[in-house]
Regions:
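Active-site microenvironment for binding and transforming phosphate-containing groups
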Residues: 1-274
Length: 274
């Protein structure tokens, strides 16, 4: 029996041999394109595995989404806190290290890739601005989600109470296991949260004599955005762990060096008026 990852926040789409997830909330906006790709159809956006396969994957997903692959903008991601504004689909980002893109232009589709890190999609339906953010644990510590939101507020006049933030499939606290050094980084940066919420769970049994901890990065990102003024009801989580579902979703933790990359795409389409 084929598995279906649909839940109250996500819909699992199967079309022309390709499978992807979409946020139900974002489907309420007819000019908005959104998706998180799955493995099915041999989709893999990791250029190091195969540049040709990555390009084929873009062609495939654009075909089922009815999106022009020539208006895809994809940055060179390096776990930074750098967020750039995009004004043209032909904009050359070069080899600059960028982990977040924002735009208020139509017919520009922002594509970022993931293999356990949290995809954060931002949408301001009032000012028609979007963002696509790559927030791994390093990006979370650097508060890239908050920085991208602040940049949308500055560039487009977005108000936090109007912004919708969607967290795509990512490694859950159930599998995001770290040692003392990384745990301390989170405690030092987010002490105000860790004292109040169960963001860090200490494992009861040592592994090879080493104390391990499990961290909830999604909760940190949520609390950071709520603190900025986003409404809790407008922060929507997929509820899907990439490691738990590594048969359908690329995962670095599960697949190790053979890992592939999933893609998150967000864009606003220019629809013809009838």
């Amino acid at each position: 029996m084929e598995r279906d990852l649909s839940n109250e926040n996500m819909i699992h789409v199967k079309k022309d041999g390709i499978e992807y997830l979409q946020f139900r909330k974002l489907l309420e906006f007819e000019d908005l394109v959104n998706c998180f790709t799955l493995k099915t159809g041999n989709l893999n956006f990791r250029r190091k595995t195969s540049e040709e396969l990555a390009l084929q994957s873009i062609q495939k997903i654009c075909s089922v989404l009815d999106v022009n692959p020539n208006i895809i903008v994809r940055p060179n991601q390096k776990h930074t806190d750098c967020v750039e504004k995009v004004d043209s689909a032909s904009e050359d980002l070069g080899m600059r290290e960028i982990d977040g893109l924002i735009t208020n232009k139509k017919d520009i589709n922002l594509l970022l890739t993931f293999a356990d890190c949290t995809p954060i999609i931002l949408y301001d339906p009032v000012n028609k601005a979007i963002g696509n953010i790559h927030s791994g644990w390093r990006g979370t510590v650097q508060k890239i989600g908050k920085k991208a939101t602040l940049k949308m507020m500055k560039e487009y006049g977005s108000k936090p109470e109007n912004i919708i933030a969607c967290f795509g499939p990512a490694i859950g606290q159930c599998h995001f296991e770290v040692e003392e050094e990384v745990k301390n980084i989170f405690e030092n940066e987010f002490g105000k949260f860790t004292k109040k919420y169960e963001i860090i769970k200490k494992q009861s049994i040592l592994k090879d004599g080493v104390q391990k901890y499990n961290i909830n990065t999604n909760l940190i990102n949520r609390l950071e955005l709520e603190e900025l003024g986003l409404l809790p009801k407008n922060i929507i989580e997929s509820g899907i762990c990439t490691v738990c579902n590594s048969d359908l979703i690329h995962s670095y933790r599960a697949n190790k060096e053979s890992f592939g990359l999933n893609a998150t795409i967000i864009g606003q389409q220019e629809r013809e008026k009838i």
